[in-house]
């Protein structure tokens, strides 16, 4: 019987869990040499990743460390017979351009989001490469897979790193001793630093400590803290690897369980759902009728009488955005709670599908009105980051609602997975195009053409410097611009560099040559 299981590719660790549950202890995992190297590498990378935090201060360092983590783990997976294919490969490749946003953009929010996506993509890649996905291919259970990869599997083998770095024989004992010593030193770190701080009132003691330790105590504490946090991150990452390769936690959040929960939620009849949505559709009809002249004028590019640009363009924009998001929630709720037809196709009732199309079309009209109003506002006052991000969000919502409409006619469409892919693609577009630089270029073009009185460069950082020089608006004596031509910038840490800063540096150097 055991030989048949081995021939079928089932390892002992798997059949103990499937047949005997927790009655019989799982056999001790014997880690290979590449896996042990990976374990030590994760400790080093964990320390490095925390040294690079926050990533918006060390964007290039964050990218290199993230790519090193991917490379180390993918090499180990391949050596262990787990090549990255299918969805795992697609998600892995998506992390490459998204992570580059940390270097291409100077926006801290975009850089942080890009790093977080890279880490989430790493977790899913390891999870999917070992065949742990709930369904094959592009599936609407992708959010549940991501949930299992990030929050379940890493803690199923959280302590496996200790065994992996220990090795065998004398190396195993030495590794355990080193970890125990490190644990003891970590526990002693706080009282030791406290004692040093209290005794530093004495000048002779301070002098002795300065002679004994050339490293600044605050810097030393930072390194030790990052090392401790890096060890926790390494435990998390290697726990994910171990659980994924052994297919642990297979009984948690299964595909059958997810479908069973979804089936139980389909409890309301289509008549009830459609009736509940009728008042909302009626309100939208009244809204479109009452505001027809004012709001539709945005499409014509003209203003209603006795209304200012700022008043018209800003009035109601965020309310329209909120209503659009509310409609997305309504569509999700009606899809989740409506009882399915008895044909066995699991499709929603035709009346519910018509309701979804009507809600989506109403939302597209609201989005188009809001975006048109924003374009009028931009035409009058130029671009700012907030205006661009608000418009970007509305475009993303538009694409999602278009997918909702297509879903009603193409039941096999993976709406959730494709919506997530749209969001990732749009975020990559936002991060890789240096939005701040394009905002500055647009404002300077309008300024030079005489259609914009005063360009707004607030919040654009280094991205605005080349455009300020082009528009004759660069004033190096201004305190806010000194960072772009001082020696501190010249001697800055290379891991802090971004593409906008490199462009600004080149533009300032060229401007300086022209002034001589």
Predicted region positions:
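Hydrophobic alpha-helical transmembrane segments in integral membrane proteins
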Residues: 428-452
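Terminal, non-globular segments
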Residues: 111-113, 117-122, 221-258, 264, ...
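Extracytosolic and intramembrane catalytic regions of membrane-associated proteins
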Residues: 458-516
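Transmembrane-helix bundle segments that line or gate the permeation/cavity pathway
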Residues: 50-207, 226-250
């Amino acid at each position: 019987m055991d030989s048949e299981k081995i021939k079928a590719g089932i390892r002992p660790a798997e059949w103990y869990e499937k047949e005997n549950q927790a009655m019989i202890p799982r056999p001790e995992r014997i880690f290979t040499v590449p896996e042990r190297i990976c374990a030590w590498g994760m400790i080093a990378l964990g320390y490095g990743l925390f040294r690079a935090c926050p990533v918006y201060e060390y964007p290039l360092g964050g990218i290199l460390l993230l790519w090193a983590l991917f490379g180390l783990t993918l090499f180990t997976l391949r050596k262990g017979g787990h090549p990255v294919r299918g969805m795992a490969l697609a998600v892995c490749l998506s992390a490459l351009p998204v992570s580059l946003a940390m270097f291409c953009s100077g926006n801290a929010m975009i850089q942080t989001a890009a790093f977080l996506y890279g880490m989430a993509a790493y977790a899913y890649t390891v999870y999917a490469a070992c065949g742990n996905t709930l369904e094959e291919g592009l599936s609407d259970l992708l959010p549940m897979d991501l949930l299992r990869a990030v929050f379940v599997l890493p803690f199923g083998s959280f302590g496996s790193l200790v065994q992996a770095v220990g090795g065998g024989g004398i190396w195993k004992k030495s590794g355990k001793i080193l970890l125990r010593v490190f644990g003891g030193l970590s526990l002693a770190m706080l009282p030791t630093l406290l004692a040093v701080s209290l005794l530093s009132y004495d000048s002779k003691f301070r002098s002795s400590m300065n002679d004994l330790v050339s490293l600044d105590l605050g810097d030393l504490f930072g390194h030790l803290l990052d090392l401790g946090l890096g060890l926790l991150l390494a435990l998390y990452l290697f726990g994910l690897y171990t659980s994924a390769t052994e297919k642990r936690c297979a009984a948690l959040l299964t595909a059958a369980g997810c479908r069973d929960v979804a089936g139980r939620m389909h409890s309301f009849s289509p008549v009830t759902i459609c009736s509940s949505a009728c008042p909302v559709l009626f309100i939208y009809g009244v809204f479109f009728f009452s505001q027809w002249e004012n709001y539709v004028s945005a499409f014509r590019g003209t203003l209603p009488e006795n209304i200012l640009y700022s008043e018209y363009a800003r009035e109601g924009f965020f309310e329209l955005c909120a209503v659009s998001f509310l409609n997305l929630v309504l569509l999700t709720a009606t899809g989740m709670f409506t009882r399915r037809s008895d044909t066995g196709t699991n499709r929603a009732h035709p009346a519910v599908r018509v309701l979804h199309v009507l809600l989506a079309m109403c939302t597209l009209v609201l989005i188009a009105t809001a975006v048109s109003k924003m374009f009028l506002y931009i035409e009058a006052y130029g671009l700012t980051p907030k205006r661009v991000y608000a418009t970007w969000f509305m475009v993303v919502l538009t694409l999602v609602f278009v997918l909702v409409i297509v879903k009603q006619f193409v039941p096999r469409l993976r709406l959730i997975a494709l919506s997530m892919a749209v969001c990732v693609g749009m975020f990559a577009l936002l991060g890789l195009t240096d939005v701040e630089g394009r905002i500055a270029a647009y404002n300077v073009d309008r300024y030079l053409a005489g259609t914009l009185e005063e360009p707004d460069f607030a919040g654009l950082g280094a991205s605005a410097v080349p455009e300020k020089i082009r528009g004759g608006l660069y004033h190096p004596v201004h305190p806010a611009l000194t960072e772009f031509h001082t020696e501190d910038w010249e001697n800055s840490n290379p891991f802090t560099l971004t593409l906008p800063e490199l462009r600004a540096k080149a533009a300032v150097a060229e401007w300086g040559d022209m002034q001589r």
